Amino acid sequence: MRRERREGTPVGLAELERRAARGRDDDGRDRNALIVCDRLVRIFTADGVEVQALQGLDLLVERGELTAIVGASGSGKSTLLNILAGLDTPSAGAATVAGFDLVTMDAAARLRYRREVVGFVWQQAARNLLPYLTAAQNVALPMRLGGGRIPRRRRAERVRELLDLLGVGHCHDRVPERMSGGERQRAAIAVALANAPALILADEPTGELDSRAAEEVFTALRTVNERLGTTVLIVTHDASVASAVRRTVAIRDGRTSSEVLRRAALDEHGDEVVVAQEYVTVDRAGRLQLPAGFAERLSIRDRARVALQPDHITVHRDDSRDA
């Protein structure tokens, strides 16, 4: 399931758009899983103490999805993103992206993976762009480092196409300090797309931006997803971003705890509205996490009563201690 590439020939934007158009099902989701995480574990040791950042996390993301990952600080979001980016290795479990086994791949495969399969956008613009290069030079750099013999003219055309696609063609010859924060982040997305990756990972890409610039950056990520068919995974605390994607996955205590799926529907007046439905995640052992707000509101602690009904399960506070 590895991404096909011709030596020295980057995948053009027009070809990516054609693939995106024919690769999606009627509901907009692609047929094949791109990311598969199965009981993923990551343990860190600090001052002789083991900390389990991921505690058996399960996640499946299909090709062509635009998904947000949310969760409190320390929930495991950044750890997951670093593993998917090839910057860290799981302690146990399984994780594959586009056919690459992130647990067992060697150094050469990891380098190829990071160059060809995944693109990363950091929150801090300084980590995305080299300050002494123009936007065009920053975008061209990954192509030059990728090892393919791309003709200079074709490379220049692709740089221009990417910058124009993301609305920063006017920044072609500007260095980062001459761009606004939003322009820098959109240029960073172009850099991440340089080698036509299957997956874009964005870690709080709007975290340092005002609301207008944040909207422009999110629109750019949506454009990449819709026009090119690139799978996009965004870690965010921005509620406006999390609520604007079709799927939002929440992580709590190192596990996926719940998801919100959104779809368009017509109300009683015939107007289009977005309908959101929240689901809890059930792991292979049959465990689920109640949404924190539910447990707090009903004062559910330590244990709860459950009862099987014909078509659902009820969960009740344990009142036996009050008797």
Language-model segments: residues:
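ABC ATPase NBD coupling module
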Residues: 48-51, 102-119, 152
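Conserved signature/switch motifs of ABC ATPase nucleotide-binding domains
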Residues: 115, 174-177, 194-195
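Helix-to-loop junction immediately C-terminal to a conserved catalytic motif
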Residues: 85
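Catalytic Walker B motif of ABC-type/P-loop ATPase nucleotide-binding domains
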Residues: 200-203
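Short coil-to-helix segment of the ABC ATPase nucleotide-binding domain corresponding to the Q-loop/switch region
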Residues: 132-141
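Helix N-cap at the start of a conserved alpha-helix in ABC-type nucleotide-binding domains
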Residues: 211-213
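Conserved ABC transporter NBD signature motif
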Residues: 93-101
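Conserved ABC ATPase "signature" region
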Residues: 100-101, 140, 147, 152-171
